[in-house]
């Protein structure tokens, strides 16, 4: 199962999953994706 948490450090509109994932790595998450509202959500297995 995958858990999602909105990124605390991502700034601006999320248009690139790669950029989102890079910011999430600095927040100690293994990955991240943009959602439909252009926000960055960090993901991890839970």
From Swiss-Prot:
GO terms for biological process: defense response to fungus; killing of cells of another organism. SUPFAM superfamilies: Scorpion toxin-like (SSF57095). It holds the Pfam family Gamma-thionin. SMART domains: Knot1. Keywords: Antimicrobial, Disulfide bond, Fungicide, Plant defense. InterPro entries: Defensin_plant (IPR008176), Scorpion_toxin-like (IPR003614), Scorpion_toxin-like_sf (IPR036574). Disulfide bonds join 3-46, 14-34, 20-40, 24-42. It comes from the Eukaryota. Belongs to the DEFL family. Plant defense peptide. This is Defensin Tk-AMP-D6.1.
